[in-house]
Amino acid sequence: MVAAQAKLVYHLNKYYNEKCQARKAAIAKTIREVCKVVSDVLKEVEVQEPRFISSLNEMDNRYEGLEVISPTEFEVVLYLNQMGVFNFVDDGSLPGCAVLKLSDGRKRSMSLWVEFITASGYLSARKIRSRFQTLVAQAVDKCSYRDVVKMVADTSEVKLRIRDRYVVQITPAFKCTGIWPRSAAHWPLPHIPWPGPNRVAEVKAEGFNLLSKECHTLAGKQSSAESDAWVLQFAEAENRLQLGGCRKKCLSLLKTLRDRHLELPGQPLNNYHMKTLVSYECEKHPRESDWDESCLGDRLNGILLQLISCLQCRRCPHYFLPNLDLFQGKPHSALENAAKQTWRLAREILTNPKSLEKL
């Protein structure tokens, strides 16, 4: 048994050093190329409208606010200033979303975003995005990369297609630090010793983002309050949970396997599903020793089996907001197909670790 585990870990490490590192290098190169174009577009936006200031800065070889959805798809979060005159209201009526309401006694004129405040005193995510979309469309025509970049049509999101190969979504957002949403108040679970109190404090201090984007849970329910709502996102908090042991390596293996074998019709699976399942695996295996290099095979296998279970149940709860289903809106046939493919992949890796050389 120990010999079989060691053999699997050996082949996973080989796969990581060859395939995962090559994937990382290729994506890093793409990110540099894509960010040059996005920065140029945002610079042009800022000239037209100084309230939209580019926050796409490179620090320690990574760009703040950039998320890799897949090797050809990215999201750039554009942090906006001055949320201060608004109260964050998160009553759970819109799963995964919250609203920003003008604080009592504050005048509209005190806000930097005065014309985007609704009659009821809410800062409208939709109105801000609509204005931003108009500015980006104008900037694309003026910027120095105008020959290689164009807007993606037929969406209220701000999406750029670059060199006909890459899609980048630019999402206006507010950063919320030092507060924690009520809809995530159950976390951490009291009976689970992971993460420890110090990491919990770090994660909560990191806070979350409020994004102006289409909320999939509200599809078909377009009342004005809902289209004015902001989507909760916990990217930095989630990144902190992946620190230590072989967690990041495990996630890198899962992303690479997804890119190569689970890029399927209907797009049932993305990197974020993998990241979510690593967090759940951490809860199931709370001891640091469970994430030792020697356990890499067990952890990967556990996550793949959990993924199959989620696909078969057609439900993958968000880690911090379990009322939010990450498979919402995905075609059932696509989820069934993904379950079969994941099962084949898991069986292949477990019964014949050497097969990783060809995967």
Swiss-Prot record:
GO biological process, one term: cornea development in camera-type eye
GO CC terms, sorted: nucleus
Residues involved in Mg(2+) binding: 73, 75
Localization, UniProt: Nucleus
Residues binding a ribonucleoside 5'-triphosphate, per UniProt: 23-24, 63-66, 248, 252-255
EC number: 2.7.7.-
Primary location: nucleus
Gene Ontology MF terms: metal ion binding; nucleotide binding; nucleotidyltransferase activity
Keyword match Transmembrane helix: no
Family of the protein in this entry: Belongs to the mab-21 family.
Function: Putative nucleotidyltransferase required for several aspects of embryonic development including normal development of the eye. It is unclear whether it displays nucleotidyltransferase activity in vivo. Binds single-stranded RNA (ssRNA).
Oligomer and partners: Monomer. Homodecamer; composed of 2 back to back homopentamers. The protein may exist as monomer in solution and oiligomerizes upon ligand binding.
Record protein name field: Putative nucleotidyltransferase MAB21L1
Gene: mab21l1
